[in-house]
Curated annotation (Swiss-Prot):
Listed Pfam families: ARD (PF03079)
Keyword field contains Amino-acid biosynthesis: yes
Record EC number: 1.13.11.54, 1.13.11.53
HAMAP family noted in UniProt: Salvage_MtnD (MF_01682)
Keyword Aminoacyl-tRNA synthetase: no
Alphabetical list of InterPro entries matching this protein: ARD, ARD_bac, RmlC-like_jellyroll, RmlC_Cupin_sf
Listed cofactors: Fe(2+); Ni(2+)
Record-given protein name: Acireductone dioxygenase
Gene that specifies this protein: mtnD
């Protein structure tokens, strides 16, 4: 269940989280992951074959999203503290940036933090298992792992060409620091 953390407020109620994110132009849903995947998702790391098994177990969700939003591809990203080069990998995304394509994530294990500056306001969305978030193209955001240092997320794509981060000067988009 996602949690919103703002300057003076924390929002934890699922309906209020969804309403707040909708107001900010983000799509948020909460989906249950199939119990049949619990054992494999409980592992810290996954082989390529295990990733394919997980994606196969979630094919029904991909089929729904293809029909609703036109996604053409998906993959599974597995991040944890023992992934070689994890610090360098996270350093690409923990600074304010945009993408020229939407960024779509379905968190199926672990947790992380998406940060945003929208309409001059800074806030964080703490995501965990079952959270689905779609960030529109050109939205100021960043991502980092939380203290658990572990996340598994399905990424959905319409086109891979918009995936290079374009870094943004925070002082130009933040109204109240």
């Amino acid at each position: 269940m996602a949690t919103i953390v703002k300057k003076q407020e924390t929002i934890q109620d699922k309906d209020q989280v969804k309403a707040y994110l909708t107001q900010k132009g983000l799509v948020y849903e909460s989906y249950k992951t199939p119990e049949s995947l619990d054992l494999i998702l409980g592992q810290k790391g996954l082989s390529d074959a295990e990733k394919e098994e997980v994606l196969s177990g979630l094919e029904y969700r991909f089929d729904q999203l293809k029909k609703q939003h036109g996604y053409k591809a998906n993959d599974l990203v597995v991040l944890h503290d023992e992934v070689p080069g994890i610090s360098d990998m996270l350093a690409k995304f923990d600074k304010l940036h945009i993408h020229t394509d939407e960024e779509v994530r379905y968190i199926i294990d672990g947790s992380g933090i998406f940060g945003f500056i929208i309409d001059g306001e800074r806030f964080e969305v703490h995501v965990g298992k079952g959270d689905f978030i779609s960030i529109p193209a050109n939205t100021n955001h960043w991502f980092t792992l939380d203290q658990t240092m572990r996340i598994k997320a399905v990424r959905y794509f319409k086109d891979n060409s918009g995936w290079t981060p374009v870094y943004v000067d925070e002082s130009k988009v933040l109204i109240n620091a």
